[in-house]
């Protein structure tokens, strides 16, 4: 350890050709501080989740070493790989005065004691399809009080299924007519989205009434009677609405009324 000493003793003999004498050579070796050795770490998290390491073999310093047995070391700096270092407060833990840095896919909070938590940012990782992966890389620095070493902490972020987003649609028809929508520019799925680019959307349910209200459930591919007509919806979002003139007879010329249905879109 630093300032410890040890001796290496040698015996030598001198001679004048007739007689000889023996003496010793003692070399005192003084220890100096050995730098700690930081080891690269990895962890994994889903795009919509949080991973926390607060004890044991998963701490940042669990595999780090120092040849000086009596040395203890702490995390002193953290950075996004390739970015500027941020100081980690002495005596901190991830949930008490920890230092926070934001990476590509989430936010990492680190304590001087090697504890950390990583909160994935789902909006940043929305482009990941289910089971696709991406990495978020950070560097951390440890110190034994005199010397330092730096290693990486890499998170593998795995994509999960993102729910589709349905967009409200409108149509118009005269009271004695039929509206048929059979193209992809105005059907029910037009404007609906899914962050998982490979997802295939379908209509999975239909009912009368507005979203959040009660109504009568129908079946995909079968007619569902509303207030002023009958709606038939296919799974691919195409639909036909047949106005019921008898139900709309009270409407004067150019008067309008609405018939509202709620549909559910699914990505499977």
Predicted feature residues:
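Acidic/polar, solvent-exposed loop/turn segments
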Residues: 1-268
């Amino acid at each position: 350890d630093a300032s410890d000493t040890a001796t290496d003793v040698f015996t030598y003999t001198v001679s004048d050709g007739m007689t000889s004498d023996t003496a010793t050579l003692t070399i005192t070796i003084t220890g100096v501080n050995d730098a700690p050795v930081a080891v690269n770490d990895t962890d994994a998290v889903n795009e919509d989740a949080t991973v926390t390491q607060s004890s044991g073999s998963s701490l940042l310093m669990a595999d780090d070493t120092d040849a000086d047995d009596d040395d203890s070391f702490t995390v002193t700096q953290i950075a996004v790989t390739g970015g500027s270092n941020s100081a980690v407060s002495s005596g901190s833990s991830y949930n008490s005065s920890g230092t926070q840095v934001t990476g590509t896919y989430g936010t990492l909070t680190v304590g001087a004691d090697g504890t950390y938590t990583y909160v994935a940012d789902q909006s940043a990782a929305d482009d990941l399809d289910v089971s696709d992966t991406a990495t978020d890389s950070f560097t951390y620095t440890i110190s034994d009080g005199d010397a330092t070493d730096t290693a990486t902490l890499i998170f593998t972020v795995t994509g999960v299924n993102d729910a589709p987003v349905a967009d409200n649609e409108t149509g118009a028809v005269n009271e004695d007519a039929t509206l048929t929508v059979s193209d992809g520019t105005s059907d029910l799925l037009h404007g609906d989205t899914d962050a998982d680019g490979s997802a295939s959307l379908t209509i999975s349910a239909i009912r009368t009434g507005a979203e959040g209200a009660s109504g009568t459930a129908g079946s995909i591919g079968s007619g569902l009677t509303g207030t002023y007509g009958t709606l038939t919806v296919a799974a691919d979002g195409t639909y036909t609405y047949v106005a019921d003139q008898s139900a709309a007879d009270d409407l004067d010329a150019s008067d309008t009324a609405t018939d509202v249905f709620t549909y559910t879109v699914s990505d499977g």
